[in-house]
Amino acid sequence: MAVTPYVDTSRLDGKVALVTGSGRGIGAAMAIHLANRGAKVVVNYANSVEAANKVVDEIKSRGGEAIALQADVGEVSQTTKLMDDAVAHFGQLDIVCSNSGVVSFGHLKDVTEEEYDRVFRINTRGQFFVAREAYKHLSVGGRIIMMGSITGQAKGVPKHAVYSASKGAIETFVRCMAIDCGDKKITVNAVAPGGIKTDMYHAVCKEYIPNGENLTDEEVDEYAKTWSPMDRVGQPMDIAKVVGFLASEDGEWINGKVIGIDGAACM
């Protein structure tokens, strides 16, 4: 009786992945993790070329292949060029992770038109057109993975209407886009992180804590870890591992879904 050889379907060997906003934080963790799984990676950045190059260097130090490409995904023409350049460099594109985003807090009475537009330009409009261009450039059977937020699903957060709404729209995007992308067998999903300890973590986290502005960074950590029964704060790699799964063959039958990743946190 012939034995079927084992194939590690979690691997991404032969695939090319592009991660927007991957010079730092969750995006950097995604890029590094996808490379660790075998993918060649395009590290996108808007302004921080030094940070992006550090991610590329780390990937290469582990034996992977990566390139840093600049583009502001708030400008559709730059998004199109980013995808064109990725395909020109690596010859194909199989995975697009739409990670770029901005955060915003402000009471309803204080939110300006400029602030509203700034947030939706990247978090919502930007992600929509990243997905559009991904559809055009991805190989058959590709993956689009978008970035939501637990605030798009959770109870109301004070002074967070604009940001939460900009992320809530992503949930509708993935449900509809998954149908549109079916003709190319492309899956479309999103991850919705809770609080994740990135370089912006302490400043942002204080906004979720009553009187948080008076807490030290250590006190913020102690408070925030109580949100999860796991008694710890989320890390960028917690998100990257789920993205790696969705990007792999193992995640093929997950489509049109938003996966909350918050350690069962209750803010």
From Swiss-Prot:
Active site: S149 (proton donor), Y163 (proton acceptor), K167 (lowers pka of active site tyr)
UniProt KW keywords: Melanin biosynthesis, NADP, Oxidoreductase
Pathway where this protein functions: Pigment biosynthesis; melanin biosynthesis
Reaction(s) catalysed by this chain's protein: scytalone + NADP(+) = naphthalene-1,3,6,8-tetrol + NADPH + H(+)
EC number: 1.1.1.252
Protein family: Belongs to the short-chain dehydrogenases/reductases (SDR) family.
Name of the protein described by the UniProt record: Probable tetrahydroxynaphthalene reductase MYCGRDRAFT_87994
GO BP terms in the entry: melanin biosynthetic process
Known partners and oligomeric status: Homotetramer.
Keyword Oxidoreductase applies: yes
InterPro entries the UniProt entry points to: NAD(P)-bd_dom_sf, Sc_DH/Rdtase_CS, SDR_fam
Chain positions recorded as NADP(+) binding sites: I26, D72, N99, R132, Y163, K167, I196, T198
Function: Probable tetrahydroxynaphthalene reductase; part of the gene cluster 29 that mediates the biosynthesis dihydroxynaphthalene (DHN)-melanin, a bluish-green pigment and a structural component of the conidial wall. Catalyzes the NADPH-dependent reduction of 1,3,6,8-tetrahydroxynaphthalene (T4HN) into (+)-scytalone.
Gene3D superfamilies: NAD(P)-binding Rossmann-like Domain
GO MF annotation: an example: tetrahydroxynaphthalene reductase activity
Enzyme class: oxidoreductase
Species annotation: Zymoseptoria tritici (strain CBS 115943 / IPO323)
Coiled coil (UniProt feature): none
